[in-house]
From Swiss-Prot:
Alphabetical list of InterPro entries matching this protein: ExoRNase_PH_dom1, ExoRNase_PH_dom2, ExoRNase_PH_dom2_sf, KH_dom, KH_dom_type_1, KH_dom_type_1_sf, NA-bd_OB-fold, PNPase
Role according to the record: Involved in mRNA degradation. Catalyzes the phosphorolysis of single-stranded polyribonucleotides processively in the 3'- to 5'-direction.
Family statement: Belongs to the polyribonucleotide nucleotidyltransferase family.
Lineage: Bacteria, Pseudomonadati, Pseudomonadota, Alphaproteobacteria, Hyphomicrobiales
Name of the coding gene: pnp
Domain KH: 555-614
PANTHER family xrefs: POLYRIBONUCLEOTIDE NUCLEOTIDYLTRANSFERASE, POLYRIBONUCLEOTIDE NUCLEOTIDYLTRANSFERASE 1, MITOCHONDRIAL
Name of protein: Polyribonucleotide nucleotidyltransferase
Matches recorded under CDD domains: KH-I_PNPase (cd02393), RNase_PH_PNPase_1 (cd11363), RNase_PH_PNPase_2 (cd11364), S1_PNPase (cd04472)
GO molecular function, a single term: RNA binding
EC code(s) of this entry: 2.7.7.8
Key words of the record: Cytoplasm, Magnesium, Metal-binding, Nucleotidyltransferase, RNA-binding, Transferase
GO biological process: mRNA catabolic process; RNA processing
Reactions performed catalytically: RNA(n+1) + phosphate = RNA(n) + a ribonucleoside 5'-diphosphate
Annotated organism of origin: Brucella ovis (strain ATCC 25840 / 63/290 / NCTC 10512)
Length: 714
């Protein structure tokens, strides 16, 4: 019934298995991949024909984690998986980026890649395995995919590169780098690092590329026995038509790309396009020598060619800069004085408003991952409204691109944040992109660094980011610093590097062509370092280190520690005690399992009141000390007084006053505030209190006062 094929190799000290022919047989390609005991299923389906008029390649990658893979049941009312989590979105992008450039130019059939995590051993992260499975499924599917690719995770532990470190090893690693590519070239890099130098980062990329070669060989081996017949797809030869369009638009496009201002340049390009359309699609003529979608493809190709020719031939870029110059930078902080921290970062025609907000433990984000639930105390959200590029568009929940750019900036900033013990705040940074002409994610990195320093967050060092580009024709190449949107779109590489003056904290690379050598990457990293240091210098003109004090409107947090066996006393039955403390004092309180108590309020008096209350609950009252209390009950034999938090003690009728008392209520009433001295404990451990030895006006011990008077008289 099943015609199965299976290939198994040893990779990074664990068995990797790729198998096809048994599951999802109606898909164009389906591969079940296992690494250790983590298992994923990758499927590929591509439409037989493109939709009429389609002028782009509609590829969708969906990575989905099923909670049953880790032996869990989803939370929530419906008890089933819902919309994609942030991690699922990020892994979907991670797989999409290296496979997209490898589809044959001109292929426009609707294509969907679905990767499902079926089993998680809680040791091997499924993201790399999913990339391998997707590549294998595409390779055997028959669609025009010029792979295979593979990916690998590289760690850096004790000065050594580690291939695919398991989940428990990652906290020890100074690097979390994912690299993907073909047997010849690197196509994609995504990483977070602890201020590592350029040569270590480049070494990690090359180590990863070398390490995944056995996986590519395994996929080829599987394809040799299991691949479907390649689809009969021949890319259109548009060279003759392209030459005709070039003759009409070359001069206009060359002039348009001399205009440095973005909107004016776009208007000139649109005018050139409209002129060419009139030439090739005259009004009233039904039969034309090319289709509208062919013209659109050709025009885009010609835009790229002219920009690339100009850069390689003259060394001058669209906006007149040379290859390594960064656009003018203006940095401002404190632009929104009522927020906790704010910054406006402008670089050329790219601009971001970043606002930092400080919160308490209650504000931490609860993340329910396959590996378990954990709290995240640093959030960075990136918003890209359509007005930032002068357009109208959809507003609403963040798209994949916004989530991806936010995470890239998060990775850049995260290594420089203070430890929770030093700064016990939850931090949220929000980047609003108000203008965009390339590299808005790196503007977010710079703006976030400024806003955090403005908020008084003691980051280790300021962080800046820069986006690099590449134009390569044959042996000639040019590396571009601080690329524009057009240079990103029309170039061969998008290479984002963020870090401090001492090293890299985040690196993201997407390459659209084969043949990016180690030499080119080395040039790009060195050029990026110069640009990064320049940007840090410009940022320092606004603020160079974190403010010594938090902003006026930021909450204050004080930390105290209590014995773990007293936690239940502070919380109370059903949370009764802690709710009362919060309601009466106005402070926010968060208690950790280890007895760490964080008390937050913008009012110092509220913090002190809460601290005093909690201290009264967890501390033991001392014999001989005087305490303020409240009468909670009266009886014939005396009064019960609540003192020192939840403790009650008895003031015997003989201890109510110096004179003889006939009736308790002659001296005290329920609810009355009184001063009491702790005299000791009776044989049953009950608290014995006295009022008569304490001056009820001053709270001072009467005996002590008399002794003092006697001493003064002498």
């Amino acid at each position: 019934m099943f015609n199965t094929h299976k290939v198994e190799i040893e990779w990074g000290g664990r068995p990797l298995t790729i198998e096809t022919g048994k599951i999802a047989r109606q898909a164009d390609g389906a591969v079940l991949a296992t690494y250790g005991e983590t298992a994923v299923l990758a499927t590929v389906v591509s439409a037989k024909e493109p939709k009429p008029g389609q002028d782009f390649f509609p590829l969708t990658v969906n990575y989905q984690e099923k909670t049953y893979a880790a032996g869990k049941i989803p939370g929530g009312y419906f008890k089933r998986e819902g919309r994609p989590s942030e991690n699922e979105t990020l892994v979907s992008r991670l797989i999409d980026r290296p496979i997209r450039p490898l589809f044959v130019d001109g292929y426009k059939n609707d294509t969907q890649v679905v990767i499902t995590v079926l089993q998680h051993d809680l040791e091997n992260n499924p993201d790399i395995l999913s990339m391998v499975a997707a590549s294998a499924a595409l390779t055997i599917s028959g669609v025009p995919f010029m792979g295979p690719i593979s990916g690998a995770r590289v760690g850096y532990i004790d000065g050594e590169y580690v291939l695919n470190p398991n989940i428990d090893e990652m906290p020890e690693s100074k690097l979390d780098l994912v690299v993907a590519g073909t047997s010849e070239a690197v196509l994609m890099v995504e990483s977070e690092a602890q201020e590592l130098p350029e040569d270590v980062m480049l070494g990690a990329v090359m180590f990863g590329h070398k390490s995944f070669q056995p996986v590519i060989d395994a996929i080829i081996k599987l394809a040799e026995v299991a691949a479907k017949e390649p689809r009969d797809f021949q890319p259109e030869d548009l060279s003759e038509l392209e030459a005709k369009v070039l003759a009409v638009v070359e001069n206009d496009l060359r002039e348009a790309y001399k205009i440095t201002e973005k909107q004016a340049r776009y208007a000139a390009v649109d005018a050139a396009k409209a002129k060419a359309k009139e030439h090739f699609f005259p009004e009233g003529v039904e039969e034309t020598e090319m289709l509208a979608e062919q013209f659109a493809t050709i025009f885009t190709h010609l835009q790229a060619k002219i920009v690339r020719w100009n850069i390689l031939d003259t060394g001058n870029r669209i906006d007149g800069r040379d290859l390594s110059t960064v656009r003018p930078i203006v940095s401002e902080v404190g632009i929104l004085p009522r927020t906790h921290g704010s910054a406006l970062f402008t670089r050329g025609e790219t601009q971001a408003i970043v606002v930092a907000t400080l919160g308490t433990g209650e504000d931490e984000q609860m993340i329910d991952a396959l590996t378990g639930t954990y709290k995240e105390s640093f959030m960075l959200h990136y918003n890209f409204p359509p007005y930032s590029v002068g357009e109208t568009g959809r507003m609403g929940s963040p798209g994949r691109r916004e989530i991806g750019h936010g995470k890239l900036a998060w990775r850049a900033i995260h290594p420089m944040l203070p430890a929770a013990e030093q700064f016990p705040y939850t931090i949220r940074a929000v980047s609003e992109i108000t203008e965009s002409n390339g590299s808005s994610s790196m503007a977010t990195v710079c703006g976030t660094s400024l806003a955090l320093m403005d908020a008084g967050v003691p980051i280790v060092r300021p962080v800046a980011g820069i986006a690099m580009g590449l134009i390569k024709e044959g042996e000639r190449f040019a590396v571009l610093s601080d690329i524009l949107g057009d240079e990103d779109h029309l170039g061969d590489m998008d290479f984002k590097v963020a870090g401090t003056e001492f090293g890299i904290t985040s690196l993201q690379m997407d390459i659209k062509i084969d043949g990016i050598t180690e030499e080119i990457m080395k040039v790009a990293l060195e050029q990026a370092k110069g640009g990064r240091v320049h940007i840090l210098g410009e940022m320092a003109k606004a603020i160079s280190s974190s403010r010594a004090e938090l902003g006026e409107f930021a909450p204050r947090i004080e930390v105290m520690n209590i014995p773990t066996d007293k936690i239940r006393d502070v919380i109370g039955s059903g949370g009764k005690v802690i709710r009362e403390i919060v309601e009466k004092t106005g402070a926010k309180i968060n208690i950790e399992d280890d007895g760490t108590v964080k008390i937050a309020s913008s009012n110092g008096k509220e913090i002190e009141a809460a601290k005093k209350w909690i201290h009264s609950i967890v501390a033991e009252p001392e014999v001989g000390e005087i305490y303020e209390g409240t009468v909670v009950k009266t009886a014939d034999f005396g009064a019960f007084v609540n003192f020192f938090g939840p403790r009650d003690g008895l003031v015997h009728i003989s201890q109510l006053a110096a004179d003889r008392v006939a009736k308790t209520t002659d001296v005290v009433k329920e609810g009355q505030k009184v001063w009491v001295k702790l005299m000791g404990f009776d044989e049953r451990g009950k608290v014995r209190l006295s009022m008569k030895v304490v001056d009820q006006e001053t709270g001072k011990e009467i005996v002590a006062e008399k002794k003092k008077e006697e001493v003064d008289a002498e």
